[in-house]
A protein has these predicted regions:
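Alpha-helical membrane insertion/targeting regions
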Residues: 2-11, 19-20, 52-54, 58-62, ...
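Acidic, low-complexity intrinsically disordered segments
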Residues: 71-107
Length: 107
C-alpha cells in the first residue's frame, strides 16, 4: 500500500497470503484455504483445470459462507461445492488456526 492508498477501517488484511491444501475432489477440483484472519474469517478457494478457460474458480469466506469470484462453474457444480464446504467447514476452521492439515496432523 503506498501513501496515496488507504485501507478502509472495517477491512482486516490477512497476515499472510499462505494457502493450505485441503482436498482434491473426484472432478479434479482443488480446495485450499487460508490461515484464519484476525477477524476470524477464512478464505476457501476452489479451482479446477479446464481445457477451454484454463481454470474455473470460486471463493468462499467462512464462517459467513459468502461466495464471490465464481467463474466457469455451473450452478450444479457450485451447489455440490457448497455442500462439501458446509460439511467440512469445522475442519477447515480448525486447520486454518494450525497451519493447515499437514501441520495439524504433525506430518
Amino acid at each position: 500500500m503506498n501513501a496515496s492508498q488507504t485501507k478502509p477501517e472495517n477491512v482486516i488484511l490477512p497476515s499472510s497470503n499462505m494457502m493450505y491444501p485441503f482436498m482434491t475432489l473426484d472432478d479434479n477440483a482443488e480446495i485450499v484455504h487460508s490461515e484464519m484472519g484476525k477477524d476470524g474469517r477464512v478464505k476457501v478457494y476452489i479451482e479446477k483445470p479446464d481445457a477451454k478457460d484454463g481454470f474455473h474458480r470460486a471463493t468462499c469466506y467462512l464462517p459467513s459462507y459468502t461466495w464471490e469470484d465464481i467463474f466457469g462453474f455451473s450452478d450444479e457444480e457450485i451447489n455440490r461445492y457448497k455442500k462439501v464446504i458446509e460439511s467440512t467447514a469445522h475442519l477447515i476452521m480448525e486447520f486454518s488456526q494450525k497451519g493447515g492439515f499437514n501441520n495439524a496432523a504433525n506430518l
